[in-house]
C-alpha cells in the first residue's frame, strides 16, 4: 500500500522542486549600478543647495555582490563663498538587505558614540534599476541607479 502512494508522490515532489526558484533575492540585484539621475536631473546633478553653497554629484557607482555586501563610490563637488571649490571621492563598504522588491543599503551596525554616521538608503529595485533615498527624512533626494551591462 505504501509503494503506490510513494510512486504517486515522487513525481509531484520532483515537479515541485523543479519549479522552485533557485535564485536568491541578493543574486537578483548583484552587479554594478551607475548613478543616472538625482531627483530626475541627469549627472552631474545638484545634490543639495543652500543660500551660499551648492553640492554636486558628479558620478557614483554602487557595486553589490550576491552575499549582501557591496561598495559605494561617489564623486562630488562642493562650491561655497567666496568662489571656493572642493572636489573629492567618497568610497565606503556597505551591506544590503532585501524584502520583496524593497532594498536597504548601508550599515546595520549601531553608530558608535560621538561618531557622525550617515543613515541608510532605502528604495525599490527592478531587474535593471535601483531607486534609493535616505530613510531618515522625507525631503531627501532620490538617486536612480541603472545596472551596468557586464563585459
What is each residue range found by the language model?
Residues 15-18:
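C-terminal motif of bacterial Sec signal peptides marking the signal peptidase cleavage site
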Residues 20-93, 97-151:
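Lipid interaction determinants
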Residues 1-9:
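Bacterial N-terminal signal peptides that target proteins for export
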